[in-house]
Amino acid sequence: MSNFSLSLKDAQDVAIMSPTGYINDLGAERLELTSEQYLGKGLRKIVINFSHVQFINTLGVSIFTGIVQKTMDHEGQLCFTNMKKIHRDIFETVGLIEHVRVFKDEKDALSYLSDRD
């Protein structure tokens, strides 16, 4: 399945990534590369909006683990928003939720991050 696209925007010092479709090998790799580019540019606050994510396969989950680790290595903050219950349950099962902040929507995540340095 290659039904994937990625929308990007910045809100002050926060990078917002909004994937659409299936997060499988190519989609997950694009998310990982984009997050690495943001971290490499010195952006330490990243929001991933899951509102248009339909499916995440096991490779996608493992790449999210890498994104979480790299964000932690850069002393960054990673927030997930608009997660469907099934996606949240998967991330809870593999322990990723312990290392990110989950918010109902982007507005809540941006409000939280605006209070952080």
Regions found by a protein language model. Give the residues of each.
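STAS-typified acidic loop motif
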Residues: 2-33, 50-52
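A short, charged, amphipathic alpha-helix used as a generic interaction element across diverse proteins
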Residues: 109-117
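Short acidic-hydrophobic, aromatic-tinged amphipathic segments that line or gate anion-handling sites
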Residues: 101-105
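Amphipathic alpha-helical interaction surfaces in cytosolic regulatory modules
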Residues: 25-99
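Short, ordered loop/turn segments at secondary-structure junctions
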Residues: 83, 106-107
